[in-house]
C-alpha cells in the first residue's frame, strides 16, 4: 500500500467513524475501489489498527471530561457515595451503558462477521430513516447532565445495535439520544463519551490479535503508522466540527448521505463490483465503531 493510499484510508476512517454514516461501509467501498482485498491479512490488520487513531482522538478531545468523570466516580466510591455528584453519576452511567454492547459483542461476534454486504446497504438506509424520524419527532431539549440510568441503558442498547455492519456506532447512539429528547449536541457528546470504555477494550483485543499479521512487513507497517496518525489528527478535527455543526444545524445531511451510500452499495452489488457475501471489514469497536 502506498503512503498516499494509507493517508486516504485514515481520512476516510476519521470522517466516517464520528459522523453517523458508518465507517464499515465506507472502508468497504474505498478498499474495493483501490483494489485491496480483506482476504489479505495485512490489509485486514491495517483496517483494524487505524481505528485506534480515532479512539485516540476521542481520548485527547475529551481528556478533561474523562479525567473529571473518573476522578468524581473514584472519589464517590471511596467516600461511600458513588452517585453523590452529577459527574460521578454520569461516570457510572457510562459504564452501565457499555454493558449491552459488551455482552452482545461477546455472544454474537462470529455471527455478525458472517453478515453480507446486503446487510450493510440495508442498515445504511434503515438507520437513515430512523434518524430522519428522530430529527422530525424528538423534542431536542435535554442536556448531558439530564442523563439517567434508563437513558444510559437504552442508548447502550442502541450502541449494541451498531455491531450490525453499516449501522454506525455514532449513528445508532446519536439517534437513540435524540429519540430520548436530548439535543443533537448532547446526544453526540454522550455518544462519544460512551464510546470510550468499549472502544478501548475492543480495540486492545483486536490490536493484540492483528498486529502479528504485520510482523516483517516493513512497507505495510509504515503505511499503517501513517494511516493511524492521519485518522487521529483528522478524527480530532471531525469531532470538533460535528459538535459545532449540531449546535445550530440538523442531521438531515447525514440522512441523505446514509441513504445515498446504501443505494450506491446496492448498485455495486448488483453490478458485480462488490460481492453479496460477507467480505466487509470487521465493524469498528462499538465502536463500535466509534466510532465515531
UniProtKB/Swiss-Prot annotation:
Subcellular localization(s) per the UniProt record: Cell inner membrane
Origin species: Anaeromyxobacter dehalogenans (strain 2CP-C)
Note: Bacitracin is thought to be involved in the inhibition of peptidoglycan synthesis by sequestering undecaprenyl diphosphate, thereby reducing the pool of lipid carrier available.
UniProt record, GO biological process: cell wall organization; peptidoglycan biosynthetic process; regulation of cell shape; response to antibiotic
PANTHER family assigned: UNDECAPRENYL-DIPHOSPHATASE
Molecular function in Gene Ontology: undecaprenyl-diphosphatase activity
UniProt xrefs under InterPro entries: UppP
Protein name, UniProt field: Undecaprenyl-diphosphatase
Catalysis: reaction(s): di-trans,octa-cis-undecaprenyl diphosphate + H2O = di-trans,octa-cis-undecaprenyl phosphate + phosphate + H(+)
Amino acid at each position: 500500500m502506498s503512503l498516499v493510499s494509507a493517508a486516504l484510508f485514515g481520512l476516510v476512517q476519521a470522517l466516517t467513524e464520528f459522523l453517523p454514516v458508518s465507517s464499515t461501509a465506507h472502508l468497504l467501498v474505498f478498499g474495493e475501489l483501490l483494489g485491496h482485498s480483506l482476504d489479505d491479512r495485512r490489509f485486514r490488520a491495517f483496517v483494524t489498527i487505524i481505528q485506534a487513531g480515532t479512539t485516540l482522538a476521542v481520548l485527547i478531545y475529551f481528556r478533561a471530561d474523562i479525567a473529571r468523570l473518573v476522578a468524581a466516580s473514584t472519589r464517590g466510591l471511596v467516600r461511600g457515595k458513588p452517585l453523590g455528584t452529577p459527574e460521578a453519576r454520569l461516570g457510572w452511567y457510562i459504564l452501565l451503558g457499555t454493558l449491552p454492547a459488551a455482552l452482545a459483542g461477546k455472544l454474537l461476534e462470529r455471527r455478525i462477521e458472517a453478515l453480507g454486504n446486503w446487510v450493510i446497504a440495508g442498515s445504511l438506509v434503515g438507520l437513515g430513516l430512523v434518524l430522519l424520524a428522530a430529527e422530525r419527532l424528538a423534542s431536542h431539549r435535554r442536556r448531558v447532565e439530564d442523563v439517567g440510568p434508563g437513558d444510559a441503558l437504552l442508548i447502550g442498547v442502541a450502541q449494541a445495535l451498531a455491531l450490525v455492519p453499516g449501522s454506525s456506532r455514532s449513528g445508532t447512539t446519536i439517534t437513540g439520544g435524540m429519540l430520548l429528547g436530548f439535543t443533537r449536541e448532547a446526544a453526540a457528546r454522550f455518544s462519544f463519551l460512551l464510546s470510550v470504555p468499549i472502544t478501548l477494550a475492543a480495540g486492545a483485543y483486536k490490536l493484540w490479535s492483528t498486529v502479528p499479521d504485520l510482523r516483517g512487513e516493513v512497507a505495510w507497517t509504515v503505511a499503517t503508522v501513517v494511516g493511524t496518525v492521519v485518522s487521529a489528527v483528522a478524527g480530532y478535527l471531525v469531532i470538533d466540527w460535528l459538535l459545532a455543526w449540531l449546535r445550530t444545524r440538523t442531521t438531515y445531511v447525514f440522512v441523505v448521505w446514509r441513504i445515498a451510500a446504501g443505494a450506491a452499495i446496492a448498485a455495486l452489488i448488483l453490478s458485480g463490483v462488490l460481492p453479496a457475501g460477507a467480505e466487509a471489514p470487521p465493524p469498528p469497536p462499538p465502536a463500535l465503531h466509534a466510532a465515531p
